[in-house]
Regions:
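Conserved FAD-binding catalytic core of PHBH/FMO-like flavoproteins
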Residues: 2-37
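Short, glycine-/Ser/Thr-/acidic-enriched flexible segments
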Residues: 3, 27, 36-37, 103, ...
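Short beta-strand-initiation
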Residues: 8, 15-17, 83-84, 93, ...
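Pocket-edge structural micro-motifs
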Residues: 24, 31-35, 82, 99-100, ...
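C-terminal catalytic lobe of FAD-dependent flavoproteins
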Residues: 17, 26, 47-188
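Central beta-strand plus flanking loop segment that forms part of the substrate or channel wall
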Residues: 1-7, 63, 256
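Glycine-rich phosphate/pyrophosphate-binding loop
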Residues: 32, 37-56
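Glycine/proline-enriched, intrinsically flexible loops and inter-domain linkers
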Residues: 139-140, 144-287
Length: 287
């Protein structure tokens, strides 16, 4: 409803601590939110659903509304004439989906833009067009390549849990090395329990729980986020020294495995790899 002094050209305001944003809307104020935990919409989507809204949800919006009224006291008395509630697409890692699908050649995707579609449209459109015309990525676009997800990410339970976290990351601190908190323990190594018993602090890569570092000297195996040197630094240094000066064992369960067969397999690998691959059967080569 109208608020004294409000007008269309009011600057957009954002309060990441309160997870809200607001701007002028005529002679009123529009209030929105990127809540830390959003509400997944996983009901069957009608085939003809496009640019439509769903029902009001004042209960879910109660916290952002209270935060908005604290930030803009005039909202206490003005009220709201309209509640706009519609679904938005978010991906499991907060990066959009682009490129040719692995299941069907010549089918290209540009979707899941995580509320930054307008801001990303120019660059995404250009590089996708060049990708289609040229037949390959014009630059390194692996972080948004649709092929980066495996079957584990096409699971409703996984998506429901992870999507609730992703939206809120827009207004959370972008810590270096931040790990997702939801939809964890999807894919575990046979050694997972033994690694955990040795103090492993796990991160997730392609759904696999993999040790990032091992806690030492009674410390907790939990990441303490910082823009400076983080709490794992000395632990990592000890592991590095052990690998250089003594011996280390690596669990490579979570790494991809490719099998190359055929008469020219060795020649191709010798060309691709930096190390000598021509070794007897049963040996391994680090390259």
């Amino acid at each position: 409803k109208p608020i004294d002094g409000a007008f269309d050209e009011l600057p957009v305001g954002r309060d990441p601590d309160l997870c809200i944003y607001f701007r002028g809307e005529g002679n009123a104020v529009m209030l929105g939110a990127f809540q830390a935990r959003s509400k997944p919409w996983d009901v069957p989507v009608p085939d003809d659903f496009a640019f439509q809204l769903i029902g009001d949800d004042w209960e879910k919006f109660a916290e952002p509304l209270a935060n908005g009224q604290w930030r803009i006291p005039a909202l206490h008395s003005s009220g709201f004439e309209r509640f706009v509630n519609g679904p938005e697409s978010f991906t499991p890692d907060n990066n959009f989906l682009m490129g040719e699908t692995p299941e069907l050649r010549s089918l290209f995707v540009a979707a899941g833009f995580n509320s930054v579609g307008i801001a990303s449209a120019g660059g995404a459109g250009r590089y996708l067009a060049e990708w289609i015309i040229g037949g390959h990525m014009p630059i390194d676009l692996w972080s948004v390549d649709v092929r980066r997800f495996g079957a584990y990410a096409n699971n409703t339970a996984f998506l429901r849990e992870r999507s609730a976290e992703i939206l809120g990351l827009h207004y959370q601190m972008a810590w270096p090395n931040r790990e997702f908190e939801t939809a964890r323990n999807i894919r575990l190594s046979p050694l997972h329990d033994r690694l955990a018993a040795q103090g492993a602090s796990f991160g997730v890569k392609a759904g696999w729980e993999r040790p990032n570092w091992f806690a030492r000297d009674g410390m907790r195996a939990e990441m303490e986020y910082s823009f400076g040197r983080q709490n794992w630094f000395e632990c990592h240094a000890a592991e590095h020294r052990a690998a250089r000066e003594a011996v280390a064992v690596f669990d490579q369960t979570g790494f991809g495995k490719l099998e190359l067969r055929g008469r020219d397999a060795l020649a191709v690998l010798q060309r691709l790899c930096g190390n000598n691959i021509d070794v007897p059967v049963g040996h391994g080569v680090y390259t």
